[in-house]
């Protein structure tokens, strides 16, 4: 049984974050407002190479929370968990808590 998947090249393995359907105080949120396409980076590949063979590292690191496109990525199931593989350039941004 597989324990861990390490992506190749400039790919990242992401576990989508499921947004809660209601707030802590019990207010139900509309489906559209809770549909922020974000995920936690689980693993990253080493990066890709440019035309001169120089390594271009991946722009995110394990543990980052990233904003993802609504569609795309390759779905991967490891055990009971569901993940998605994206290319580094497909990530729309990194989310930070202030």
Curated annotation (Swiss-Prot):
A single Gene Ontology CC term: mitochondrion
Expression triggers: By heat shock treatment.
Gene Ontology process terms (BP): response to heat
Transit peptide: 1-17
Keywords of the record: Chaperone, Mitochondrion, Transit peptide
Main location: mitochondrion
Record family assignment: Belongs to the GroES chaperonin family.
Function: Seems to function only as a co-chaperone, along with CPN60, and in certain cases is essential for the discharge of biologically active proteins from CPN60.
UniProt cross-references to PANTHER family, sorted A to Z: 10 KDA HEAT SHOCK PROTEIN, 10 KDA HEAT SHOCK PROTEIN, MITOCHONDRIAL
Complex formation: Forms stable complexes with CPN60 in the presence of ATP.
Name of this chain's protein: 10 kDa chaperonin, mitochondrial
């Amino acid at each position: 049984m597989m324990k861990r998947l390490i992506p190749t090249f400039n790919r990242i393995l992401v576990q989508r974050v499921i947004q809660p359907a209601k707030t802590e105080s019990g207010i139900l949120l509309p489906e559209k407002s809770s549909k922020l396409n974000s995920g936690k980076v689980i693993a990253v590949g080493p990066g890709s190479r440019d035309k001169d063979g120089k390594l271009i590292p991946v722009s995110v690191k394990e543990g980052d929370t990233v904003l993802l496109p609504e569609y795309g990525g390759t779905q991967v199931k490891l055990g009971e968990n569901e993940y998605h593989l994206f290319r580094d350039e497909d990530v729309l941004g990194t989310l930070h808590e202030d």
